[in-house]
Swiss-Prot record:
This is Uncharacterized protein HI_0603. InterPro entries: HemX. To E.coli HemX N-terminal region. PANTHER family: PROTEIN HEMX (PTHR38043:SF1).
């Protein structure tokens, strides 16, 4: 029995250090477990925060996109309205220009008709002048006045027909009338009466400024070209 006691004591002593070591290892493993659990919790919290921030960013981003889309839609509507208004104004302007062009063309047509009419009348006057001149040669020495008046009428006719120069034609007719005043002849008076009638008509015609009409027509043509390009 005495021999067995030392062995038991040895076993107890041997078991005691092992238990202490195990206890120490167990105590060391507890904080590690706590640290691991704490790190996992922090990671989850960070992920949740990141997800929350990302969701908020996505929400605000969607709001901004919606606002931008609204502004684009409003801008498109405004642009469409402006284009429609511009087209309406351009159509009105084009209508006005077409009306002005039509009026100018009518004035030019009237001018051409009157020139043709006056050309025939002046030609008739020339014929009468020749007849009167032939009679006057035998009656009085004023035939040179008839010749001068005939020359003036020829020039007036040329200016009117070839150059469409109404003002110069009027001046020449006035000179012819002043020349015939010096002739004491009933036929000369008849010619003067016809010249005065032509002068009245040509003076009313000269109020139409042909250069102004042509300039206006050119401006109208340029404006029509610009609208077509629009």
């Amino acid at each position: 029995m005495a021999k067995e006691q030392p062995n038991d004591l040895t076993e107890q002593l041997t078991d005691t250090p092992k238990t202490a070591v195990e206890q120490a290892e167990t105590m060391q493993s507890v904080p590690q477990t706590i640290v691991k659990k704490t790190g996992t919790a922090l990671s989850l919290l960070a992920i949740l925060v990141a997800l929350g921030i990302g969701g908020a960013g996505y929400y605000f981003g969607q709001q901004q996109m919606a606002k931008i889309q609204q502004k684009l839609t409003a801008l498109e509507n405004q642009t469409g309205a402006n284009l429609s208004s511009n087209n309406t104004n351009n159509n009105k302007r084009l209508t006005q220009l077409e009306q002005s062009l039509k009026t100018a063309q009518e004035n030019i047509a009237q001018l051409e008709q009157l020139i043709v009419s006056k050309t025939g009348e002046i030609t008739s006057l020339q014929t009468q002048m020749k007849q009167v001149s032939q009679l006057a040669i035998a009656q009085q020495p004023s035939d040179w006045l008839f010749s001068e008046a005939d020359f003036l009428l020829n020039n007036a006719l040329r200016k009117l027909v070839l150059d469409n120069d109404v003002d110069t034609a009027v001046s020449l007719l006035k000179l012819a009338d002043e020349t015939l005043v010096k002739v004491n002849n009933s036929q000369a008076n008849e010619i003067r009466s016809a010249i005065n009638q032509d002068l009245k008509q040509l003076l009313s015609l000269s109020s139409v400024d042909q250069n102004a009409i042509m300039q206006k027509l050119s401006q109208l043509a340029n404006t029509v070209d610009e609208l077509q390009r629009l």
